[in-house]
Amino acid sequence: MGSYYSTESTKSNESNETTNNVEGIVDTIGGTVESINSDGIITTSENIVEIVLKENNQPTIFETQESNILEIVTTKIDVLKKILRLIGEVTSECQFSFQNVNEGGRIIVTELHDNKTILLKLVLKGTGFDFYKCSKSKITARLYLPDIDEALGLIGVDDTNTNPIIISMKKDKETSIFITRIDNSGFTEQVELPCRESVGLNIPLPKTTFQGKIVINAEKFRKICERICSVSDLIKISLTDKEVSFSARYYNLDFRYKHSVESKVLGQTIENYFFIDGMLKFIKYFQSSDEISIYIKKDFPLVIHGPFDNFGSIYVFTSPIEE
């Protein structure tokens, strides 16, 4: 079984080929913007902003600190924990890239599984949070995921506390991330997370012109994968210009699901085998009503792309294997 990913310092092919609506999978940062405001934020002075919290549509006053080069405000503790669980499917130590770009900034995570057969890219929009400020074009922080989970447990255990959590980095201490919250008694709780040494990750994301695109409901695809998983470790995906089938071999029987599709296979059939467990790990992070896109090409990593709540997008690359 070959690996399509490497952490060696090799540059990926920067060709002009498109990827059938997934050009955003491989992108470069081409500039910065000076000011970042997310929807629902009214600036009342240089450092005081009134935020309308997305959780309960209630306004709250937040004072930004000039000493902070990074500030993220959110009441969505459950989403933060979901992010940790998602990344934890691949690794226990993650490098976050906080970026100051157009449309409110973003956070990017690109991590490779230890077996080098699954690559996860998570893109979170700054506008998904109640407030997002990144004073540099890019800030990198490598953190141990269990440390973050423990910190959220320490200051997020009180379900009656509706105050938001603040994630920040100080200008004079770029070696730590701070998680802060005011409790119901007015006391400030803060946990300092030491950043681990950042590594110069150069994981080239597979880039190609895909031959087919499958659009399917996330819940439907999850059920198909679960049923196939009950009889086999492998799933075979076969694609023609009119139809896709998901199948598995069970003793002398072929177990198959079919789905109509528009693709660019043009009279040929594409067949690839994948480990079903690698897909099931990530499908559960999509909401049942989500539509996901599956991009496929013969002997090339499968790409599953879909929304992550209202925070951004998930891209999962999984390598094909020999039957």
UniProtKB/Swiss-Prot annotation:
- Keywords from the UniProt entry: Lipoprotein, Myristate
| The organism of origin for this protein | Acanthamoeba polyphaga mimivirus (APMV)
| Domain of life per record | Viruses
Please list where the region (Disordered) is annotated.
Answer: 1-21
Question: One GO BP annotation here?
Answer: regulation of DNA replication
One GO MF term, please?
Answer: DNA binding
Q: What is this protein called?
A: Uncharacterized protein L823
Q: Which PANTHER family match?
A: PROLIFERATING CELL NUCLEAR ANTIGEN
- List the InterPro entries: DNA_clamp_sf, Pr_cel_nuc_antig
Lipid-binding residues (covalent, N-myristoyl glycine): G2
